Amino acid sequence: MKDFPVFPTDFGVSSIILREVPYRREAYIHIQDVQPEHVSAHLSECVSFCRMVGAETVLVREHPALDGYPLHTSVVEMRGSAWVDPALLRNVFPVTEQTVGQWRRICNERMACVDNAATLEEKDENRILKSGGAYFVHDRGELLGIGWLEDTKLLAVAAVKKGAGQEVMHTLMSLVEGADMNLEVASTNERAIRLYEKLGFLKTGELFRWYRAYPVADRDL
């Protein structure tokens, strides 16, 4: 679905991201140029458009005039040193042209309910391959999970087997052992945050917030 980098109303201008509507039924608004007193009226028109094209949830990125709107999630940065427990080290296989489709489907399935995680489309497969940082993690032929690294930044990680998160992470960290790693995670992804903290990662700052523009109950405002 087409995004709108510039979406003007009588009250200002925003960008509207619709690419997740077919998958998550979510739309995203980035306020560009709106006076604080006009934010509510501007968002009302943006939300109406998003709902018209099928969005059931509309989120708006952080803006000074959004304090009265309910917080959906915040995105925080975490940093830590890559270290490896040899007892948890498993086999890692890079994604190839033959397996990138499978990797992408697994990633989408595991991230479907994770806030701030983008759905990967078929057109993204070339980018995944060119990055050279997408992997499968196996143990004696059993798929444990997947991961995606960009240098020392963790772009994505997902366990396929229940309880395999530490094994997947230690195996991925073995690829950059000793380096300082960083990642971004939604505050609502509490299970992932607990895992990262167990591995020694610390929150180093809040990057931005998503507020809920629709649905919004009267009591929320």
Label the predicted regions.
Residues M1-V53, A112-K123:
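N-terminal charged segments
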Residues K2-S14, K130-G147:
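Conserved beta-hairpin
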Residues I31-N91, L207-R212:
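Acyl-donor-binding surface of acyltransferase catalytic domains
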Residues P36-S48, K161-V176, I193-K198:
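Conserved acetyl-CoA-binding loop-helix of GNAT-fold acetyltransferases
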Residues E56-A65, K161, N182-I193, R209-D218:
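Conserved beta-strand-loop-alpha-helix junction that forms the acyl-donor binding cleft
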Residues H63-S74, Q166, T188-E206, V216:
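Conserved active-site alpha-helix within GNAT-family acetyltransferase domains
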Residues P86-A118:
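Short amphipathic alpha-helix that is part of the acyltransferase structural core
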